[in-house]
């Protein structure tokens, strides 16, 4: 389901691989990202540039991943479109997750903080 790309300093960008992250696929998404963390990934960028819709289950999966990574690393989001941004704001997730316009900006910011 997910697609990954590795960047410098153990930074991994993750694309969910779906247009809609919902109750139907959020558990699979979470399980696959948690497996990356268990394999040693500690700085993750979730790239939502291809995701047009996100429901509460998708947000729940994302917060579950954040809880799993804990203080061992960092989790940020990038590429949020208007609807996904609105969902983040309504649920106040914009206060929880750092957001960047694209993966490149997220990689640069994370690299500077390592």
Predicted regions located by residue number:
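A charged, well-structured terminal subsegment
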Residues: 98-114
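STAS-typified acidic loop motif
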Residues: 3-31
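Generic signature of intrinsically disordered, low-complexity, basic-rich segments
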Residues: 4, 53, 101-105
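Non-catalytic signal-transmission and effector/linker regions of two-component phosphorelay proteins
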Residues: 1-7, 111-114
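Residues that form or immediately flank small-molecule/cofactor binding pockets and catalytic motifs
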Residues: 9, 82, 104
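Amphipathic alpha-helical interaction surfaces in cytosolic regulatory modules
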Residues: 20-97
């Amino acid at each position: 389901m997910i697609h990954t790309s590795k960047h410098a300093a153990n930074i991994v960008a993750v694309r969910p691989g779906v247009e809609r992250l919902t109750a139907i696929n959020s558990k699979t998404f979470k399980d696959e990202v948690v497996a990356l963390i268990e394999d040693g990934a500690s700085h993750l960028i979730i790239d939502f540039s291809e995701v047009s819709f996100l429901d509460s289950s998708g947000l729940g999966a994302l917060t579950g991943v954040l809880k799993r990574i804990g203080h061992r690393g960092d989790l940020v989001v990038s590429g949020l479109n208007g609807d996904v941004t609105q969902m983040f704001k309504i649920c106040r997730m914009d206060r929880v997750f750092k957001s960047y316009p694209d993966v490149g900006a997220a990689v640069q910011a994370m690299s500077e903080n390592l």
